[in-house]
Amino acid sequence: MWQKPWGYKEGFAVCGGLFLVGTLWQVTLGKCTLSLFAWPVNIYAGVVYVLLLLALYLFFRKYYFVRWMSSYQTAVSAMISLVVMTVIMGLTRQYRPEVAVTGVEGWLGFSQMLSACSFVLLFFWFVTLLGIVILRRIHHFTVRDIPFLLSHLGLFFIAVRLNSTTIKIVCSTA
């Protein structure tokens, strides 16, 4: 492992590390409250984030780690990790953010998906990878890249737009 070329094992290792860091963060500091990023701060944070992605790509694109970030192995491992987290959280009863959750559910954050630090870190990793891939394709632009760029830019903007401060929680009772 960690022998070039990096592949799926390294991608899943990074995602597992992010999950572990997020879980430890959740256990020690509590859930991720992203209310700081409510309007209009989310616009400023989004612009700064895109500028940081641009700087990362422009100044460090020749580094192996940054090139690896735009590989399909990294993207697939990030997507699978997010899908697994989403399925686990989808099978776990969800509680409103203001409800205090105790026990293992509270430690792991599975019962408050939008506040789970592990989910937030994995989602941030996925959006970062998506941004790096878009910048790489723009840098080496050809006409046949237009459909790729349109679909990935749309996904990027939708993913960046979906954060816990913009999602309205709807409760249904049977």
Summary of predicted features, one role per range:
Residues 1-174:
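Solvent-exposed, non-transmembrane regions of integral membrane proteins
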